Design a protein with these regions (language model features):
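Acidic anion/phosphate-binding donor-loop and adjacent secondary structure
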Residues: 122-123, 138-155, 204, 227
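A short, active-site helix/loop in glycosyltransferases that binds the activated sugar's phosphate group
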Residues: 100-131, 139-143
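A charged, aromatic-enriched C-terminal amphipathic alpha-helix characteristic of glycosyltransferases
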Residues: 149, 290, 294, 304-334
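Nucleotide-activated donor-binding/catalytic signature segment of Leloir-type glycosyltransferases, i.e.
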Residues: 203-226, 231
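Conserved donor-binding/catalytic core segment of Leloir-type glycosyltransferases
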Residues: 150-182
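Aromatic "clamp/platform" in nucleotide-sugar-dependent glycosyltransferases that forms part
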Residues: 240
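Glycosyltransferase donor-sugar binding loop
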Residues: 162-166, 178, 190-203, 218
């Protein structure tokens, strides 16, 4: 029986935790075991999903002939443009440097989450010295499906934002979502629902400034996301320069079309009529003011032809983002 060591174990919310859970489930279906400790030998390969200080342990396993596969996310960057505080700044820079060290000196193979991520790492830290491949994130298409419980209004359109964390510099996504909702509210009966970790101060301030009805969902468990996606009419993908946003993939799997700016990996993911992407209108890396009217126009088009976009979104997910496809491609890298 094959066994994969996935480290470090993620115990938080967000992308890494979601990926590890999906990967473990997909491996279990194939009869492959998982552990989360380098000392729990034997195993057949190591999958590194974020930073770790266990460099000596990884090098020891590499000398034994095991593949050490690094799954690379994007590079921390918002802290360089926003006042997130010295502690956050140092932690973000340390994380970047440690990942770069692992990439250049320790691992035997690299999986980039998107072509965008591959180019980003290459531009900032130079070309990799080991074999690499791009594997987009996947999702369980039976759990994340248009079929299932939902409460989707036929009179009020719901604009949905789903992010694990909308703090630490990511508050800009909330401001943009509110601005988008304000522009749409003149054309459509509309409510804005924001799911993710948001400070109570930001909630209060936003509610005062906006005339659009707002629903704050807070942090939710993964199994609560499909009903939320099914109950909305369009997802605004709020993360600028995102590496491979799970929320967009999960939305499409549930038949929820995606709207956003054409930054990061979104142009690789949201194709055909699975949604609409528009040029940012300024420099997203400098957090310049975005082109909200263009975004509102694209969103209006989705709301006016929602059924067609919903069908196309699901088709795109079935075509490219199945969990089985993702796990199979990772196993090709891990086990050869």
């Amino acid at each position: 029986v094959s066994r994969i060591c996935i480290i470090p174990r993620a115990d938080n919310t967000g992308g890494v935790s979601s990926f590890q859970a999906k990967m473990a489930a997909g491996l279990a279906v194939r009869g492959i075991q998982v552990c989360h400790d380098l000392d729990e030998t034997p195993y057949d390969a190591v999958l590194l999903t974020s930073t770790t200080r266990q460099l000596l342990g990884l090098l020891r396993q590499r000398r034994r002939g095991l593949r050490i596969v690094q799954r690379l996310d994007g590079i921390n960057w918002l802290h360089r443009h926003l006042p997130t505080g010295p502690r956050h700044f140092l932690r973000a820079e340390y994380g970047n440097r440690l990942l770069a060290l692992l990439r250049s000196r320790v691992v035997t193979h690299i999986v980039y989450q998107s072509e965008f991520v591959r180019g980003w790492w290459g531009a900032q830290f130079g070309p990799e010295r080991v074999p690499s491949v791009v594997i987009h994130n996947g999702v369980d298409l039976s759990a994340y499906s248009p079929d299932g419980p939902h409460v989707r209004s036929i009179t009020v359109s719901r604009l949905l934002v789903v992010e694990g964390n909308l703090q630490g510099g990511y508050e800009t996504g909330v401001a943009t979502a509110i601005g988008l909702a304000e522009l749409l509210a003149g054309q459509f009966p509309l409510e804005l629902m924001i799911v993710g970790r948001v400070s109570s101060r930001l909630q209060t301030e936003s509610q005062k400034l906006s005339r659009v009805p707002m629903v704050w969902g807070g942090l939710v468990l993964p199994d609560q996301i499909p009903p939320l996606d099914r109950s909305a009419h369009v997802l605004y993908s709020a993360d600028l320069n995102a590496a491979c946003p799970n929320s967009a993939i999960e939305a499409m799997a549930c038949g929820l079309p995606v709207v956003g700016f054409a930054t990061g990996a979104l142009p690789e993911l949201v194709t055909c009529d699975a949604g609409r992407l528009v040029p940012y209108g300024g420099d997203p890396w400098k957090l310049e003011k975005p082109d909200l009217p263009a975004l509102a126009g694209a969103t209006a088009g989705i709301l006016q032809d929602n059924a067609r976009f919903r069908e196309s979104a699901r088709h795109r997910a079935e075509e490219a983002f199945s969990l089985d496809l993702m796990v199979g491609r990772y196993l090709d890298v891990l086990l050869g």
